[in-house]
């Protein structure tokens, strides 16, 4: 931000799920809050996990590769709802610390969107209990 940036246009989060160490909710929360602190009140846009084509989540898919046009983006996340919920809950908690937007990759139809919003609603209920 010191060089005049107006925020973080796209923070890729997939690296947090590298084989051997998948960050839990608290670790993700701490990472996102550190990004928000570094942005000093400017908007941070986080892209949710985007596995497929050139990226895999080995622990979730047990080494199965996605095809180029098949299981990618939001559809990949929706196949692993527990991990998606962990990320969304961490993002929602972090959003209390600064301006944060969430971008779901490769939403192709209303079913993708509705399914993602069900996860968001689940996390909202969980965090307000």
Residues of each region from the PLM?
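Conserved alpha/beta-domain cores
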Residues: 1-129
């Amino acid at each position: 931000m010191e060089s005049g940036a107006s925020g973080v246009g796209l923070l890729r989060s997939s690296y947090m799920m590298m084989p051997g160490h998948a960050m839990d909710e608290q670790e993700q929360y701490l990472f996102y809050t550190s990004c928000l602190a570094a942005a000093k009140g400017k908007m941070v846009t986080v892209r949710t996990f985007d596995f497929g084509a050139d990226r895999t989540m080995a622990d979730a898919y047990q080494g199965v590769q996605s095809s180029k046009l098949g299981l990618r983006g939001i559809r990949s996340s929706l196949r692993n709802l527990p991990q998606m919920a962990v990320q969304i809950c961490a993002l929602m908690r972090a959003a209390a610390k600064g301006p944060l937007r969430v971008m779901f990759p490769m939403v192709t139809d209303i079913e993708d969107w509705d399914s993602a919003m069900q996860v968001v609603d689940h996390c909202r209920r969980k965090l307000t209990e």
